[in-house]
């Protein structure tokens, strides 16, 4: 087998293990990597690396299926999804499966079907992973040249990149098909408190779609996380889908330009580092979406955002005191600010008190009460609907920032048993996983650059901590 990596970068290298138990192509002498280096041992055996990737995909799909069935088994119809620690059923509900007006879950059978389909798919992938890891050819170059590769073959690597982009593009278009042709998506902004609807007029104007990309990520602009209607969400997926497909075919049909050949490091570890930073970026973006956005992460399923919980507290007390006879338009609080209503920095009428810090909140339950200059006094006095009152009261007691003592209306007491908002789970998990992936990117990028420069020699195993451990054989 042709060796694609110079072994000089791995020596002086020693192994604490019995060399007699090594397997050619997978032991430290032939690969330069010890057993704990994982897929690094498979750098030059494309068939076995394929097996590892397929098996990994099987594990991910298995988790999706098993966890979906776990959530279905523990689902309690009388409680909202966000009060039950669920993170997968909210995603399926957002896609319009099994959900009715107001975000009410009316049928969990679609979730059961999704879970079972993922389990079946994971079994197929698992079989493929085991086959390619244990039975299939070590390398694909001889038996299946179309699937073989040389890490240094820049044209082949960009072709593989193109294939991935095409598949990702079709994945984005699947959401578009679901939104327009297969039952629609759940729209939290639908009149009356949200409903599933067909998105039959997606935004195709590039100025609108790419306008999000050009927005500042700081302050109130919110970059792409600021999307606030389903037409833009679906239109964005149309643009992303066709752009990825077009870019994919571009990379399949062309060879990398000279500047790209010079600028990038072309090795397996370099490609790993590029992939890690891409996943890291997506994780960071997802964490911000989960925390701030209540359009693609509807509060009916994920619980209120921090600003939503704060504003709903002020709104709930306004409704209560107005019924008791308070003049909500003129009452002052202890600080001299409006107790119920006040003016924003830009002159709009907003909810009063300490909630002014979140005065720019946009949420489906309060938007119907706005006029051209903020909240409309006439609507506040005459048009508040029961569903708005109920939703605000529910959100007030399920703040993602829950604390035992409310400070300035930022968060109220989390009036539930063991309640942790799915927004908190999803935001923190994606942020820290994204950070870990970013560190992995720096590690592998540094090693790849050093190897390309010719001075990366690997870890000196003379002083390796594992040498102090009992041999595994």
From Swiss-Prot:
Residues 1-14 form a propeptide. Its main location: plastid. The chain crosses the membrane at residues 69-93, 134-155, 178-200, 255-275, 291-312, 447-471. GO terms for molecular function: chlorophyll binding; electron transporter, transferring electrons within the cyclic electron transport pathway of photosynthesis activity; metal ion binding. It is found in: Plastid, Chloroplast thylakoid membrane. [CaMn4O5] cluster binds at residue 367. The keyword Metal-binding applies. Binds multiple chlorophylls and provides some of the ligands for the Ca-4Mn-5O cluster of the oxygen-evolving complex. It may also provide a ligand for a Cl- that is required for oxygen evolution. PSII binds additional chlorophylls, carotenoids and specific lipids. Belongs to the PsbB/PsbC family. PsbC subfamily. One of the components of the core complex of photosystem II (PSII). It binds chlorophyll and helps catalyze the primary light-induced photochemical processes of PSII. PSII is a light-driven water:plastoquinone oxidoreductase, using light energy to abstract electrons from H(2)O, generating O(2) and a proton gradient subsequently used for ATP formation. PSII is composed of 1 copy each of membrane proteins PsbA, PsbB, PsbC, PsbD, PsbE, PsbF, PsbH, PsbI, PsbJ, PsbK, PsbL, PsbM, PsbT, PsbX, PsbY, PsbZ, Psb30/Ycf12, at least 3 peripheral proteins of the oxygen-evolving complex and a large number of cofactors. It forms dimeric complexes. This is Photosystem II CP43 reaction center protein. It comes from Guillardia theta (Cryptophyte). The gene is psbC.
